[in-house]
């Protein structure tokens, strides 16, 4: 799974289309950056850009946009309704896929330092990247706005994190940092604005003030009336959907509305949404209603229905889910995008990758998929009605493991590429040799981690496979036999891939611990596969 970071720079220009387009072009032409949205506000005189890419790519994209803005925006002439303190007012980095918050903090720091050095402008860090508590929030840093900067920069407490403490009239100052993904989510009500606002006050974390806090953490809220749709909305911002989820906000709003005898008529997501936010909601409704829904497409359709996301306008997942707008591949083509014929051809080509690690992952993924298939060939059939609850329990682990193992096909090739890249680093000076050694050891750790994860994933499947072998559709007997051997073979491949990469590692404690773990996982795979095959043979007789 490729890494994906979202960057949302806010530039202080919302009227001059030539400037807006020039900044868009600067982002779009940066390799590895995908521009998803450009939202220009004439009255605020501000444009919000949304683009994504791998960490190093989005830093370059933000810098390219800033360079362009420095030539075209003059803050001495800027007027607008939105608070601002610079030509590039704020530039947050947000983790979307395969990236930690710490990595986004590094993005913000790298961007801030390079921006300050290149343009010689003051830069502040906020959010998760803040260096001091007083700079945690954007409003705190932006207090007084652009007009206050000449005096503010003279104060010791407002020395920039990067760049000069001198006022740059044409630019102002920039704030950059890292934060969680913000989701704008509105619940529709057939009510008055005041009733909607009453619900919002009960829900939002701020509540009605310090003495009357609301129920939902990391949620902002207000009630308003949407004239063009002739209904009211509880309008919320979810500052961290992993603290308070979409479905939690919706269900709590419904409960509040029910107490006031008000009808809820769906909801609205504004802008883009992370896939995980919808899948978390799907898991909630599947659990609540005891539903058996496996496919991602079906789970999203369930959420659209339960939350009424299409009540005001069609909700097209391909246009609204951020991961769907960007292919899950890095700068190079993903092996998973290739046809089976092309994948086999590439394995057989005169190159070291994809190699045994990717093949082991593919074989294990097929083994898990076969087990899932057998479960589904048993589930929902009249003669196996008595097994429905059992299959509902057994199928999901195989379905999930198949997807996880499939992702390791690419992960193994990427880990090998990282090792190869480290080996090719220069080693002419002591510093270069140290840097190369560190990079190589880190690359080897990744090259060990991928096959170890394969073996650990398969290890979780043996109990379910044993049970499936004893009660699954007997007409699929050969499929389960192949599944057992495929899973065992995947672990067999993982074992040797771990050992070959451990050989060049220098951490003896890690080597011994990992060698012991992978050996036990291989022995377990051999034993469990034999037991599954024995159970199947006994049933055949």
UniProtKB/Swiss-Prot annotation:
Q: Does the keyword Metal-binding apply?
A: no
- EC numbers for this chain: 2.1.2.5, 4.3.1.4
- What pathway does the annotation place this protein in? Amino-acid degradation; L-histidine degradation into L-glutamate; L-glutamate from N-formimidoyl-L-glutamate (transferase route): step 1/1
Q: Where in the cell is it found?
A: Cytoplasm, Cytosol; Golgi apparatus; Cytoplasm, Cytoskeleton, Microtubule organizing center, Centrosome, Centriole
> Where does this protein hold folate?
163-172
Location of region: Formiminotransferase C-subdomain: 182-326
Q: Which GO terms describe its cellular component?
A: centriole; cytosol; endoplasmic reticulum; endoplasmic reticulum-Golgi intermediate compartment; Golgi apparatus; Golgi membrane; plasma membrane; smooth endoplasmic reticulum membrane
The organism's place on the tree of life at top rank = Eukaryota
Q: Which residues carry this modification: Phosphoserine?
A: 520
What biological-process GO terms show up in the record? cytoskeleton organization; L-histidine catabolic process to glutamate and formamide; L-histidine catabolic process to glutamate and formate
PANTHER family, per the entry: FORMIMIDOYLTRANSFERASE-CYCLODEAMINASE, FORMIMINOTRANSFERASE-CYCLODEAMINASE
Entry similarity comment: In the C-terminal section; belongs to the cyclodeaminase/cyclohydrolase family.
The UniProt entry, under NCBIfam families, shows:
FtcD
> According to its UniProt entry, what is the function of this protein?
Folate-dependent enzyme, that displays both transferase and deaminase activity. Serves to channel one-carbon units from formiminoglutamate to the folate pool.
Which protein, by its recorded name, is this? Formimidoyltransferase-cyclodeaminase
Gene that produces this protein:
Ftcd
């Amino acid at each position: 799974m490729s890494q994906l970071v979202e960057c949302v720079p806010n530039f202080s220009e919302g009227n001059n289309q030539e400037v807006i387009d020039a900044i868009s072009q600067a982002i779009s032409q940066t390799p590895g950056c995908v521009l998803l949205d450009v939202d220009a506000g004439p009255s605020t005189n501000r444009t919000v850009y949304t683009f994504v890419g791998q960490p190093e790519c989005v830093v370059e994209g933000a810098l390219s946009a800033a360079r362009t803005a420095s030539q075209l925006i003059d803050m001495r002439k800027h007027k607008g309704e939105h608070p601002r303190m610079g030509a590039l007012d704020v530039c947050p980095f947000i983790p979307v896929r395969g990236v930690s918050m710490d990595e986004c903090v590094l993005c913000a720091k790298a961007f801030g330092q390079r921006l300050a050095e290149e343009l010689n402008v003051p830069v502040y860090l906020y959010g998760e990247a803040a260096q001091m508590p007083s700079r945690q929030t954007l409003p705190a840093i932006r207090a007084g706005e652009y007009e206050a900067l000449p005096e503010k920069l003279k104060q010791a407490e407002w020395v920039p994190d990067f760049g000069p403490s001198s006022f740059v009239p044409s630019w102002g100052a920039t704030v950059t940092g890292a934060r969680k993904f913000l989701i704008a989510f509105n619940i529709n009500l057939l009510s008055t604005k005041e009733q909607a606002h009453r619900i919002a006050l009960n829900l939002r974390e701020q509540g009605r003030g310090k003495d009357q806090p609301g129920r939902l953490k990391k949620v902002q809220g207000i009630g308003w009336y949407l004239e063009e749709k002739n209904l009211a909305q509880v309008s919320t911002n979810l500052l961290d959907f992993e603290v308070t989820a979409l479905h939690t906000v919706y269900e709590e709003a419904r409960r509040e509305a029910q107490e006031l005898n008000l009808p809820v008529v769906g909801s609205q997501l504004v802008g883009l949404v992370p896939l995980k936010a919808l899948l978390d909601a799907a898991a909630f409704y599947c659990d609540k209603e005891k539903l058996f829904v496996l496919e991602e497409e079906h789970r999203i359709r369930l959420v659209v229905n339960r939350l009424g996301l299409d009540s005001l306008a069609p909700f097209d997942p391909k246009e609204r889910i951020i991961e769907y707008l960007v292919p899950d591949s890095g700068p190079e083509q993903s092996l998973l995008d290739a046809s089976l014929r092309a994948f086999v051809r590439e394995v057989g080509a005169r190159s070291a990758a994809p190699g045994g690690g990717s093949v082991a992952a593919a074989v294990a993924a097929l083994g898990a998929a076969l087990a899932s298939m057998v479960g589904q060939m048993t589930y929902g059939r009249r003669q196996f009605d008595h097994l429905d609850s059992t299959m509902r329990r057994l199928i999901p682990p195989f379905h999930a493991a198949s997807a996880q193992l499939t992702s390791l096909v690419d992960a193994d090739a990427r880990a090998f590429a990282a090792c190869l890249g480290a080996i090719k680093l220069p080693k002419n000076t002591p510093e270069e040799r140290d840097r190369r050694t560190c990079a190589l050891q880190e690359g080897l750790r990744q090259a060990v981690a991928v096959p170890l994860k394969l073996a650990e994933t398969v290890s979780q499947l043996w109990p379910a496979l044993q049970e499936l072998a004893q009660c699954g559709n007997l007409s699929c007997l050969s499929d389960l036999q192949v599944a057992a051997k495929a899973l065992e073979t995947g672990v067999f491949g993982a074992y040797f891939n771990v050992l070959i990469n451990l050989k060049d590692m220098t951490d003896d404690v890690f080597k011994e611990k990992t060698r012991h773990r992978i050996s036990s996982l291989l022995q377990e795979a051999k034993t469990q596969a034999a037991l599954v095959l024995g159970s199947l043979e006994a049933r055949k007789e």
